């Protein structure tokens, strides 16, 4: 068993060697495998670590898996929102909330296959709705006059 890699994974999750359940998967037939617990207890509330041939693998309880996925989704959403916020502020909005709403509507109505280029989205909004942004050129010209 490639215990070093499994040690690193479980240690990064805060699961000590003592509390870790190790298993091995053994191929019995084309559609059947045998799970052998090598170390630890039958505890279905924590991840198990094991090997299937030379491949390290884990078994994760469904509730924990769902929590991990939700955490990743929330982190992705927060990251997206921070990028959008930064892009909006770079274009000097008159009212941040108005631009945010228009940007969210624009993103929802456009069917992007991957994450949209937020700078392009905000530039498009600025072009279509210039009243939502401070016109720096007219400010500079009024100062010069």
Curated annotation (Swiss-Prot):
InterPro entries given in the database record: UPF0763 (IPR019724)
Superkingdom, taxonomy of origin: Bacteria
Family membership noted in the UniProt record: Belongs to the UPF0763 family.
Record's protein name: UPF0763 protein CFF8240_1572
Protein's organism: Campylobacter fetus subsp. fetus (strain 82-40)
């Amino acid at each position: 068993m490639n215990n070093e890699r499994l040690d690193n994974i479980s240690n990064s999750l805060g699961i000590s060697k003592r509390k870790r359940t190790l298993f091995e998967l053994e191929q019995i037939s084309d559609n059947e495998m045998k799970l052998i617990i090598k170390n630890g207890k039958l505890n279905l509330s924590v991840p198990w670590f094991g090997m299937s041939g030379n491949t390290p693998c884990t078994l994760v309880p469904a509730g924990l898996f769902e929590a991990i996925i939700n955490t990743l989704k929330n982190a992705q959403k927060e990251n997206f929102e921070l990028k959008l916020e930064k892009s909006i502020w770079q274009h000097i909005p008159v009212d941040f909330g108005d631009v945010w709403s228009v940007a969210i509507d624009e993103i929802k109505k456009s069917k992007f296959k991957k994450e949209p280029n937020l700078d392009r989205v905000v530039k498009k909004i600025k072009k279509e709705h210039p009243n939502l942004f401070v016109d720096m050129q007219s400010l500079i010209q009024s100062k010069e006059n």
